[in-house]
């Protein structure tokens, strides 16, 4: 029975010595380039939109309404000493 196709271990879309793309692989991939690019654009725009929306919402947040508890001078000196020792 005759074997149809490339011999076992031979890849007709890659050069066997350099493993670079052959003109056949360029021809095979050409019709799918713009469809793949559009799909990539749509899929990547979703997380990018979520990220930009989150950044926009969080940048408007003000913390002026959160009261800062008073700290005693002894506690402040203790924290400074701890910070400077690191």
From Swiss-Prot:
**Mitochondrial intermembrane compartment segments:** 56-86
The processes (GO biological process) annotated in the record are: mitochondrial cytochrome c oxidase assembly
Q: Which residues lie on this side of the membrane: Mitochondrial matrix?
A: 1-32
Q: Which UniProt keywords apply?
A: Membrane, Mitochondrion, Mitochondrion inner membrane, Transmembrane, Transmembrane helix
Xref: InterPro entries: Coa3
The record's Gene Ontology cellular component field reads:
mitochondrial inner membrane
Give the subcellular location: Mitochondrion inner membrane
How does the record say this protein sits in the membrane?
Single-pass membrane protein
Query: Which parts of the chain span the membrane according to its record?
Result: 33-55
Quaternary organization: Component of 250-400 kDa complexes called cytochrome oxidase assembly intermediates or COA complexes.
Question: What family is this?
Answer: Belongs to the COA3 family.
| Role, per record | Required for assembly of cytochrome c oxidase (complex IV).
User: This chain belongs to which protein, by name?
Assistant: Cytochrome c oxidase assembly factor 3, mitochondrial
**Which species is this UniProt entry from?**
Clavispora lusitaniae (strain ATCC 42720) (Yeast)
Gene that this sequence comes from: COA3
């Amino acid at each position: 029975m005759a074997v149809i196709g490339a011999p076992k271990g031979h890849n007709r879309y890659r050069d066997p010595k350099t493993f670079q793309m052959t003109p056949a692989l360029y021809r095979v991939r050409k019709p799918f380039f713009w469809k793949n690019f559009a799909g990539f654009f749509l899929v990547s725009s979703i997380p990018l939109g979520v990220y930009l929306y989150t950044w926009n919402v969080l940048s408007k947040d003000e913390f002026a309404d959160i009261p800062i508890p008073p700290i005693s001078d002894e506690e402040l000196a203790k924290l400074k000493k701890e910070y400077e020792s690191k």
